[in-house]
Amino acid sequence: MKTRTIGSLTVSEIGLGCMNMSMGYGKADDAESERLLNSALDVGYTFLDTAQVYGSGHNEELIGKSLEGRRSEYVLATKCGLSREGINGDPAGIMKSCENSLQRLRTDVIDLYYLHRVDPNIPIEESTGALAKLVEQGKAVSYTHLTLPTTPYV
């Protein structure tokens, strides 16, 4: 499969968004999802995308369990700052979310860590400061943020 570059990361041209394995389209079968994840790596997918909010952590747990022993074969993207409780861009919340995601994913580093939503109550500099600190600590390779379509652009 052809590859693309995202910052310093080289990923398969087609990535696997994993949300549907834990939410959004009805109950998914974990055994079938595990087969899908492993088959995706077998055919050349190297970019997997998940988030703490997908299935309230279940999606990250599924990936961690299903692909244990294969971590060197894929680039892992996950997200923080959005949960069933709402948007939270608080630096302490971001740090805790990262620790929880690392445990669920059974890894010591997240390749691309997203702030899932910009918190209108927290200055973006504070949220991105926490993401930068995770990179400094070696818990993330890189970071970015997503925005809502209604977020004003300057």
What are these model-predicted stretches?
Residues S12-L16, L76-T78, Y113, Y143:
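Hydrophobic faces of well-ordered beta-strands that scaffold small-molecule active sites
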Residues A28-A40, D90-Q103:
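Short, acidic/polar
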Residues T144-T150:
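Conserved small/polar residues in nucleotide/adenosyl-binding loops
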Residues I122-E125:
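Active-site-adjacent beta->alpha loops and helix N-cap segments on the catalytic face
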Residues M1-Y74:
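N-terminal binding-site loop/beta-alpha segment at the start of enzyme catalytic domains
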Residues M19-M21, A51-V53, K79-S83, L115-V118, ...:
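Active-site beta-loop-alpha junctions enriched in small/polar residues
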Residues Q103-P120:
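Active-site groove signature of glycoside hydrolases
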Residues L37, E60, G64, C98-L102, ...:
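Generic structural signal for well-ordered alpha-helices
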